[in-house]
Amino acid sequence: MNDTLMVIGEALIDFIPTEQGMALKDVCSFTKHCGGAPINIAAATAKLGAHSKVLTQVGADAFGDFILETLSLCQVDITAVKRTKQYPTALAFVALDEKGNRDFTFYRDPCADLHLSA
């Protein structure tokens, strides 16, 4: 039997500051990463050698491309991921305080993953 972990839910881009301890308004440089708890779980599971699959929706945009390419590189099955031209991929900007605690600012209404339907 081939067991598969299927995750369903949000897929977004996390923009993480290159410097810690700054207010979001003062940050000049970010790195982009795939984000969303389901995406993180699928990628981590695949990196451990298990089969994982994602059911979500991303925009037909550069950020959606980045998510799909990153998941593919992690060996995550993306055959159930939908693409839409109607809504963009969700974005999250993450502020990190001096201790590394996170504070999120989301840009997700409207966004692709919130409009996933059967």
Question: For each predicted feature, which ranges?
Answer:
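Glycine-rich phosphate/adenosyl-contacting loop at the front of the ribokinase-like
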Residues: M1-V76
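Conserved N-terminal subdomain of the carbohydrate kinase-like
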Residues: H51-A118
